[in-house]
Amino acid sequence: MANDASKDPELDKLLERKAKEIAKGVKNTGNVVELNHSNFNDFIKTHDVAVVDFWATWCAPCFMLEPIIKRLAVEMPNVGFGRLNTEEEPEIAAKYYVMSLPTVMIFKNGDPVDQVVGVVPKKILQDRIKAYLND
Amino acid sequence: MYPILLGINGISYGSFTECELNVLPRLMNIVDRGVVENKKPQYPDKSWWTILNMEPTNNTPSDPSLAPLVKLTRAALINIPVVNPTYGLYSIKLDQGTSYEEEVNNVIGALIKTAAKAPVIAAITAPDRFLHNNQSIKCNVYSVIDEAIGSLINGGVSAFILFSPYGEPVGPNEGDHEEYGIYIATISRPRHYDTVKLYEIGMLFRDLVESTLGV
């Protein structure tokens, strides 16, 4: 029965909407979520605006970007911030055509809408994200 | 000027941004760059012996001048933290008795002077000595180092490897640091899409000396 129910598209939509409502109610406390194949889709779908930092351990500029992302996560509590290690999750990076690192991808309602490649000043990244916020 | 290998114990790329450094971020856009990987626990003496021996090792000979990298490159040693006090032309105790400004300025001064005559392997220990218990002075320490690297480059050093054997101190314990350090060098690495291992740093410096001096 449970399996049948999970295949119901109406029920899936209802659950997704409910998850978004819950996510909206829970303010981001400034943490950057470590993403992988098991939580990536939920993460980008349950935040109206989600920001994902694609990085790798060999990438020096990725480490320079990290404090900027952490800072923005504190300053923009209505945005979901996550980071994805592309060495551990190459399929996800390939799905979104991530060719250079670091790449910061902005998702709105689960869809990629913008990306910033390389290390940029915090203000520039913040303005790009703000453009996708409704209020 | 002869090639130099300068290790700065306990600095991370993240603080280049946090502390709004000037020289190091520009330098990493001009020459080769990478990330040094060194898993916990990280100790200065063991990390440096791995570099000097050019292989992962527990072998700690009593005399650093007999280490394979030193013998192969005939490098002069300055302030190497394989023993306490450090080993070489300039030496300090690994405590907070020497200020970070004094250590950085003396190491860079000795480096410029010595690199006119021979390859040099040198270390700066200030971040490791001061940041385990006092993060509030972090950007002061980074700024002094950044400025000193600028004077090193202006002093005519053109063949170099700058690195940290591990990242910034995390908490009060000596062996606790971030697991990723910096690598900025004028010698290219064969595997760009991989982290730099400590033993490779020794091998890369050997190659840098060989290619620069044609030996």
Residue positions per predicted region:
Chain B
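Glycine-rich, phosphate-binding/catalytic loops in enzymes
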Residues: 20-26, 138-141, 176-179
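Metal-dependent active-site segment of extracytoplasmic phospho-/sulfohydrolases and closely related
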Residues: 3-13, 23, 141-173, 183, ...
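Structured loops at beta-to-helix junctions and adjacent beta-edge loops in soluble globular domains
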Residues: 54, 123-125, 186-188
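Short, solvent-exposed loop/turn segments at secondary-structure junctions
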Residues: 10-13, 82-86, 125-129, 167-169, ...
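Histidine-centered active-site/metal-ligand motif
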Residues: 129-133, 166-177
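Active-site-proximal alpha/beta segments of enzymes that process anionic O-linked groups
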Residues: 2-3, 10-116, 198-215
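Substrate-binding rim/cap in mid-to-C-terminal beta-strand-loop elements of soluble/periplasmic
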Residues: 173-212
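A long, amphipathic alpha-helix that forms part
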Residues: 100-116, 120-122, 127-162, 200-202, ...
